[in-house]
């Protein structure tokens, strides 16, 4: 009974490590480092063809790391605030992008010799919507994840993927 619990646990942990590493891990995922999944030795397009160290696919927004929002309330936060309580002297320029719609404001005491200004622009027409790459068809060949033509012509073919030696399509 121990092996019934330990073996699936080990497989789940290895799968999770493969998912976290994506394409860049040292061969800890589904098929290991050098060589292919099923003895074909890479570049033959018989596998999933996306690095083979854990399926390195998913939504693009998940790769940049998240902007952590912490709340001590039982109700989830409905807004996001970026605040600074530092004192700045001289010219200060801040640039960047915040997710979703928002407002900008300056609070605090400004000395009579200084000035505070906010220049705020909103969006490029894609307000609150991100264009993300999604998952493929997850089929085996044909028009699925292996691409048009099955073996060797889709993501798993020469030059675009294959089982590789731990770096997927980059080798």
Swiss-Prot record:
GO terms for cellular component: egg chorion. This is Chorion class B protein PC401. Residues 1-18 form the signal peptide. Residues 19-61 are annotated as: Left arm. One of its GO terms (molecular function) is structural constituent of egg chorion. Belongs to the chorion protein family. Coiled coil: none annotated. Pfam families: Chorion_1. It comes from the Eukaryota. One of its GO terms (biological process) is chorion-containing eggshell formation. This protein is one of many from the eggshell of the silk moth. Residues 133-171 are annotated as: Right arm (Gly-rich tandem repeats). Keywords: Repeat, Signal. Residues 62-132 are annotated as: Central domain.
């Amino acid at each position: 009974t121990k092996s019934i619990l330990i073996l699936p646990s080990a497989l789940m942990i290895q799968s999770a490590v493969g998912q976290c590493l994506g394409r860049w891990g040292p061969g800890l995922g589904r098929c290991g480092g050098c060589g292919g999944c099923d003895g074909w030795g890479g570049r033959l397009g018989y596998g999933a063809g996306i690095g083979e160290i854990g399926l390195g696919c998913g939504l693009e927004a998940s790769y940049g790391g998240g902007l952590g929002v912490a709340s001590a309330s039982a109700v989830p936060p409905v807004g996001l605030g970026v605040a600074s309580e530092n004192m700045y002297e001289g010219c200060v320029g801040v640039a960047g992008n915040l997710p979703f719609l928002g407002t900008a404001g300056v609070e605090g005491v400004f000395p009579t010799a200084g000035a505070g200004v906010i220049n705020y622009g909103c969006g490029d027409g894609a307000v609150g919507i991100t264009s993300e790459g999604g998952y493929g068809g997850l089929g085996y060949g044909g028009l699925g994840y292996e691409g048009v033509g099955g073996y060797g012509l889709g993501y798993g073919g020469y030059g675009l993927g294959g089982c590789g030696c731990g770096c997927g399509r980059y080798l």
